[in-house]
Amino acid sequence: MPDLSLYKQTVDLYLSIAPGHSRDPLNAIQEHMDSMILSKLPRINGIVLAYDNIRFLEKSAKVMYDSPFSFIWVRVDVLVFSPKKGDCLEGKINLVSPSHIGLLILGIFNASIPRKSIPKDWIFIEPDTTEEQGRWKTNDGNILEPGKDLEFVVDGIQREAGLTMVQGTLANS
């Protein structure tokens, strides 16, 4: 059974409220939280997918020094995608080649299983035309092609330029 690598966390954040939002501070905080969706934040060990249950921890926001912005502590529940090495995930195959299998996790995150992490006895079947992709045939006769779901084990995580790439393995399948 695959993990989803989804976790709920409750976090306290110190956020600003622009002068134009001073009459509706909840809207200001929601805008802050919206901008954090699909971002990896230092205080949250993973990528924020959703948030809920915003609570103000102070009765009023504070204006700091000569800033036009006010600041307030809030507590928010966040849904976080945080895969770890060894997690079992499921992805939808979107690319099949002799060098790797590409997948989408949750329809959002890219994953790649390189040839060295595909069982040695699996066979790559070349495409019939240049417009098709190939297919992998497993040792029990199953055909893996774009659109099919595939379980794999997380072998590593790469984060570059704000993007997360999951590296997987099937070697123990």
Swiss-Prot record:
The keyword Membrane appears for this protein: no
Chief localisation class: nucleus
PTM entry text: Contains an average of four phosphates per molecule.
Superkingdom of the organism of origin: Eukaryota
InterPro entries tied to this protein: RNA_pol_Rpb7-like_N_sf, RPA43_OB, Rpb7-like, Rpb7-like_N
Subcellular location: Nucleus, Nucleolus
Cited Gene3D superfamilies: 2.40.50.1060, RNA polymerase Rpb7-like, N-terminal domain
Disulfide bond found in the keyword field: no
Pfam families assigned to the protein according to its UniProt record, in alphabetical order: RPA43_OB, SHS2_Rpb7-N
One GO cellular component, as annotated: nucleolus
Assigned keywords, A-Z: DNA-directed RNA polymerase, Nucleus, Phosphoprotein, Transcription
Annotated GO biological process: transcription elongation by RNA polymerase I; transcription initiation at RNA polymerase I promoter
Family: Belongs to the eukaryotic RPA43 RNA polymerase subunit family.
Subunit-structure text: Component of the RNA polymerase I (Pol I) complex consisting of 14 subunits. Part of a Pol I subcomplex consisting of the subunits A14 and A43. Interacts with ker1/A14.
Function: DNA-dependent RNA polymerase catalyzes the transcription of DNA into RNA using the four ribonucleoside triphosphates as substrates. Component of RNA polymerase I which synthesizes ribosomal RNA precursors. May be involved in recruitment of Pol I to rDNA promoters.
Protein name as it appears in the record: DNA-directed RNA polymerase I subunit rpa43
Organism expressing this protein natively: Schizosaccharomyces pombe (strain 972 / ATCC 24843) (Fission yeast)
